[in-house]
């Protein structure tokens, strides 16, 4: 975090008129993050003067940006973060091997920078004149769920969070329960001449279960009981270390895309409403 703080963010807002109206304006945002990396995101900001709550959305692995109706959530600032190398930041033809990049050392592993990007998103949202910094929230699915947990663990400015199907939890068991991302990570570690012990040592610095006891805000989590990508066992490895007010919702027939379950958006909205 000290290294991140030493990097001037150099926020740049680029208007997206085709996605704006007289209710909210849309912007593509660019900023500098850990290591001087340029990252970006999509911002919707109310046109009317005032102070507004803000919602940060952390994206799933390899997801594309999706554009909202600017008239939806007229009383909310919304920011969708694109972490390094993904979405807006992905180069044409770039492989989606991020989970294995830099595995040979904790200082070079991809998620070191990505977790810092998650905190930089909070920096950005809190820098906006219209943000009520006492009402900043976050949510995300899969990789975005992991980033939501990481952000709240590393930064106490978040008021409440709602991750679903969180990724990157309990690696030793995770790699037994699911083939991906274990297979490409293990292959990269082998190529780097690492033992399993060395690999898991590096990964322990980025295991979400080792972060969540630092969370200071309320949490609601959604899981899919049939999830083969981020199995419930791994979700609860992170959840069980949370010491604050917390709750979870299980969708027994859902696989990985639990965030698409009909009841989750309503449950999430009701949860955040308590803290608005």
Give the location of each predicted region.
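Hydrolase active-site cap/lid region
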Residues: 149-194, 250
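Acidic catalytic loop of the alpha/beta-hydrolase fold
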Residues: 225-230, 257-258
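Cap/lid segment of the alpha/beta-hydrolase catalytic domain
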Residues: 66, 70-72, 76-116, 173-182
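Gly/Ser-rich "nucleophile elbow"/oxyanion-hole loop immediately N-terminal to the catalytic nucleophile
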Residues: 100-142
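C-terminal catalytic histidine-bearing segment of alpha/beta-hydrolase fold enzymes
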Residues: 236-276
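Short beta-strand/loop motif that positions the catalytic acidic residue
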Residues: 214-215, 221-223, 227
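Short alpha-helix in the alpha/beta-hydrolase fold that links the catalytic acid
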Residues: 217, 231-240
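N-terminal cap/lid segment of alpha/beta-hydrolase-fold proteins
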Residues: 7-50
């Amino acid at each position: 975090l000290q290294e991140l703080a030493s990097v001037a963010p150099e926020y740049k807002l680029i208007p997206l008129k085709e996605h704006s109206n007289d209710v909210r304006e849309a912007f593509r945002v660019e900023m500098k993050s850990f290591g001087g990396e340029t990252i970006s995101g999509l911002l919707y900001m109310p046109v009317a003067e005032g102070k507004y709550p803000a919602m940060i959305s952390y994206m799933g692995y390899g997801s594309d940006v999706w554009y909202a109706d600017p008239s939806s959530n007229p009383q909310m600032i919304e920011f969708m973060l694109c972490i390094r190398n993904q979405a807006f930041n992905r180069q044409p033809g770039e492989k989606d091997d991020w989970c294995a990049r830099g595995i040979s050392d904790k200082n070079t592993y991809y998620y070191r920078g990505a977790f810092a990007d998650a905190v930089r998103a909070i920096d950005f949202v809190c820098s906006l004149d219209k943000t009520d910094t006492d009402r900043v929230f976050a949510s995300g699915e899969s990789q975005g769920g992991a980033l939501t947990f990481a952000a709240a663990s590393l930064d106490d400015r978040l008021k409440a969070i709602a991750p679903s199907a969180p990724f990157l939890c309990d690696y030793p068991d995770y790699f037994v329960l699911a083939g991906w991302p274990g297979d490409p990570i293990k292959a990269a570690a082998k190529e780097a001449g690492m033992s399993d012990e060395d690999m898991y040592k590096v990964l322990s610095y980025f295991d979400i279960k080792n972060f969540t006891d630092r969370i200071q805000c309320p949490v609601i989590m959604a899981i899919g009981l049939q999830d083969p990508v981020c199995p419930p066992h791994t979700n609860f490895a992170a959840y069980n270390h949370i010491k604050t007010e917390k709750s979870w919702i299980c969708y027994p027939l859902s696989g990985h895309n639990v965030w698409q379950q009909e009841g989750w958006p309503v449950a999430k909205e009701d949860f955040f409403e308590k803290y608005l």
